[in-house]
Amino acid sequence: MLNPSLAPLHDPLRLEIDYGTPRREAAEVVTLSIDGLAVTVPKGTSLMRAAALAGVNVPRLCATDSLEAFGSCRVCLVEIEGRKGYPASCTTPAENGMTVRTQSPKLKDLRRGVMELYMSDHPADCLHDGAHGACELKQMADLADVREVRYNAGAQAGANVGAAIGANHCEAAKDESNPYFTFDPAKCIVCSRCVRACEETQGTFALTIAGRGFDSRVSAGQDQSFMNSECVSCGACVEACPTDALQEKSVILLGRPDRSEITTCAYCGVGCGFKAEMKGSEVIRMVPWKDGKANEGHSCVKGRFAWGYATHKDRITQPMIRAKITDPWREVTWNEAIDHAASEFKRLQKTYGRDSVGGITSSRCTNEETYLVQKLVRAAFGNNNVDTCARVCHSPTGYGLGQTFGTSAGTQTFKSVEKADVIMVIGANPTDAHPVFASRMKRRLRGDGVNAGAKLIVVDPRRIDLVDSPHVKADYHLALKPGTNVALITAMAHVIVTEGLLSSDYIAERCDTKSFHDWREFVAKPDNSPEAFETVTGVPADQVRGAARLYATGGNAAIYYGLGVTEHAQGSTMVIGIANLAMATGNVGREGVGVNPLRGQNNVQGSCDMGSFPHELPGYRHISDTTVRSQFEAAWGVTLEAEPGLRIPNMFDAAADGSFKGLYCHGEDIVQSDPDTQHVAHALSQMECVVVQDIFLNETAKYAHVFLPGSSFLERDGTFTNAERRISRVRKVMEPLAGLADWEVTVKLSNALGYPMHYTHPEEIMQEVAALTPTFAGVSYEKIDRLGSVQWPCNEDTEEAGTSVLHVDHFVRGKGRFINTQYVASDEKVTRKFPLLLTTGRILSQYNVGAQTRRTPNNLWHSEDRLEIHPHDAEDRGVHEGDWVGIESRAGQTVLRATVTERVQPGVVYTTFHFPESGANVITTDSSDWATNCPEYKVTAVQVMPVAQPSTWQKDYAAFNRRQLDLLDQAQHPAEVMAK
C-alpha cells in the first residue's frame, strides 16, 4: 500500500497511478535505495518509475507512463550519491546499489526556479484557480511551493512585455475547430506530451513543435486548425496534456465529473476499456482505461467522443404498437406492449405452425442479452429459428476455423502483434475499422529504435492507409481483383510447398497427415501457381512469390483479416486457405503468430459464443448432438428441437413465400445492413408481426408492428466478448431511459409467451452460461471484476484469467486439418452491361449502419456515403469529383456523389453503407458464401454513369421515410399533430 503522502501523481477520480515512465520487462532485476527506501525493479526501469513503485513521488511535467521518457522539463531532477550534477530521473535507468535522493534544499531551489519559468508564460489565475484540480502544472507548482512568480513575462503582466523574450502565448487564440475538444495555447507549456502521444500512441504524427525557444508552440500540421489537419481525434493528445491546454468541450460545458465507472466500448470488436466519468446522472466524458487489456489507455474518435447518441432526442423511450405499418404508432405501457407481442406470436404459431416465427440477435448487445434471446426462441417459440448479424459478416470465420482448428475464434491477443516479425493484413482496413488495434500494429511496423519494425504484406483491392502512409509502408501490396482471394491464397501456398518452405516438423507433430498430403498434392499442381493465377487475380506472379517467401521465412508471421475475406461467395474457403497457410508454416500456437479475425462489432464474437446460430447451442455445440441437447433440456425444462432452424436469408425467403410470419428482431437493422434491400423490405412487409427492440426507429422498425425501447451500453450491465475472446464487463452508469434494460424486456416477453424466466440480474444469466458451457465454466463477474477481463476458454484446465493463445500444444480438434481450396469464380462477373466491380467497407468516423454515429458530431467528417472511382474509369464516363453518379447492378440502382481517387484500381469502385438514404445495399445481390450464406458484399458487378436525379428507389425511400416519421410523430406528439 502506498503512503498517501508519497503517492505518485494520479487523478483521485480515476484512481490510476501514473508511474512517469513505461514498465520494462526484464529477467534481471536491480536493487537500489531511494530516499532511504529499498526498491527492486526490472533492469532498465527508470529512477522515476522505481521511485513511484517505492511510494515516492518525483515531480515531473513532460513524463507520463504511457510515453517513452523525453527528459525536457527539468522538474524531475534527483541526486545520485557519488555522481555529479542533477540527472533527470525519467531518463536515468536504475542500477544496482544506487543511492538516490529526490528531496534536498538544492533540488527544491532548482525545481522552484524551473516551475517559475513555466508559470511566467502561463495564465496567472492557474496558481489560484481551484477548478483546475486535474491540472498537473498546478499540482507541480504546489509541490515546488510556487505561490507567486518573480519573473515579469507577458503572461503575468497581462501586456506585451514578454515580446522581448518571445511570443506571448497568453494572447494566442483558442482553436475550437474540433467538435469534441479545444486547444488553448495560453495554457500550453510545450512539454511535447501531446506531440509524442500523437506519434507513439496513435501513430498519426499530426502534431509538431513549431518555432524555437520562447516562440515554440504546438502546431497541428502546418499551422492548421485541428479540424483541418491530419488529426483523427483519437483523444490521445487530450489524455496526455498536463495543463488542460487540450480539454474536452463537455468538461468545459458541464464541469468536472465527480465519479467514474469502468465499462467497455460498444463500437468495434477491439473492446476498449473506458471509464465513464459522471457528474450526478450525466456522463461528462469517456476516458480510456489504462488497465484495459485491449486498448491499454488508448481510444479512437468513436469510443472516446461519439457516445452522445445515448441521450439523443431521437431515442424512443415508450413502447409502441400498431396493427399495420401504414397505421400511426400508439404509445402503450410495457405490459400492454409485451402482452400484445406475445399474443400475436401465439396466434401466428397456432395459425401457421410452430416454425412460422423466429428471432434475430444482435452483436451490439451483451452476451447475457443474446443468450436470453436465443433461449427464448428455442424454449418459448419451440424452434431453432434464431440467427445473428454475424451471419452477414463473420459466419465463414466460424465455419472455416472450426473445420481446420476446431474452434470458431481467433488465436491470439492483440498484444501478440508486438512479437510479430511479419504481418499480413488481408481484406481489412484496421486504421478505419479497428483504429486502436491499428495503432498498436503501426508501432510494431515502425519499430522502437532498438528492434527493427515488422515486415508488412497487405492483400486488398484498395490502397488502404497501411499500404503507403508517411510512417508505414507495405513491403508487398497484393492488389487483387475483388473475388479472387482463394486464387491468391492458393498461389501463395503453391510457392511455399514447391519451394520447400514448409515447417515439416510442426506439420508432422501437430497436423493430420492424410489431409496434409492431399493438400500438398493439390496446391503443388501447376494450375495453382502464381503464374497460372496471374490473369485471374491481377497480381504479378513475382509479387505473390515474394510475399509467400516473406511470410514463410520472415520469422513470426501473423495474419489479420476482416470482412474482405469473409463476405465472399468463397468466404469460408478463404478462411480455410488462411488456416492452411498458417499451419503449413508453423505459425499457430505461440506469441507473435496466428490467425486473427478482426471482428466488426463490439460483441460479434460473443453473439456467436452464446448460441445465436440456428444449428448451435452456446459454446459452438451442434443442436443435433443428443448429449449436449439433453443438458440444456434438463437445465431449461423443455424438449428442444433437434433440427437446425432457419438462417436469416431463409427467413426472408420464407416470409416472401408466406410461411414465415413473425420476427423478434433484437438490436439489429436488417433492412439497412443486409444485402438486396428491396427483397428484405418485401419480406418484412409480408410478415404479420414484426417486433423490433432498439433505441431508435431504425430502418427495420419502420416495418414493425411492435416497438420495444432498448437501452444503450451506458444503461446496461453485462459482458462483451471482443475479437481476442476477451470477456469484459459492461457496467450501468445511468438508469435505462425507457425504464427497463434489454434483458428485462426479453424476460418479460418470455414470461408472457408462457416460458418463465426468473433472473434478477445479468450476473445470474452468466452463471447459467458458465454452468452449461465448458469453455465458459470459469467465467464469473467476480473474476472479471478482480482481473479486469478473462479470455475463453476459461475453466479448470486453463490459467485463472483463461487462455491468451489458442492451440499451444495441440489444436482444439486434436490434429490440425488441411482442406483443399479450389478457386471458383464469383457469379458476380463483369459484363458489357456491368463492367465494374463494386466493393464496400467502412470509414473511421462512422460505424456500421450509422444509427449511433450519425447522431453525433462525427458527421462533420463524413456526412454521406460516396462512391470512389479510379480517374481512368471516371474519365471514360465523363465523371468529375463531386458529380452525382448512378450505380446499377442486377439487384437495383442508387445514386451517390463520386470521389475520383487512385485508392481504387481501374475497374473497381468502392462505397460505404453508413447512411440509409444512400441505399448501398440496394445494389448488393443475393450471392453468398457456399457454406454459411454470408452475403457477397465485396463483389457486385455494376455500371456507373452520371445522372441528374436520385434513383427511383431513393425517391420511394424518401417518401416512405417521411410517412413513417409522421406516423411516429402522431404517437409522440398527438396534440401538436392535431393542431396542425
Model-assigned labels for residue ranges:
Residues F414, E715-P736, V745-G754:
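Glycine/threonine-rich phosphate-binding loop and adjacent beta-strand/alpha-helix elements that clamp
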Residues V39-N96:
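N-terminal cofactor/phosphate-binding cores enriched in small/glycine residues
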Residues P736, L740-V790, P857-E868, H872-K980:
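Long, contiguous, secondary-structure-rich segments that constitute the structural scaffold
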Residues S607-C608, F613, P762-P857:
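Long, low-complexity segments enriched in small/aliphatic residues
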Residues P123, C191, I252-R716, L749, ...:
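Catalytic alpha/large subunits of respiratory electron-transfer oxidoreductases
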Residues L32-S33, N96-T102, D223, V472-L480, ...:
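Short beta-alpha connecting loops at secondary-structure transitions
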Residues T45-R49, P93, T366, R647, ...:
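Short, structural beta-strand-to-alpha-helix junction motif
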Residues L2-Y19, R74-S233, V238-T264, K279-E282:
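Fe-S ferredoxin-like electron-transfer domains
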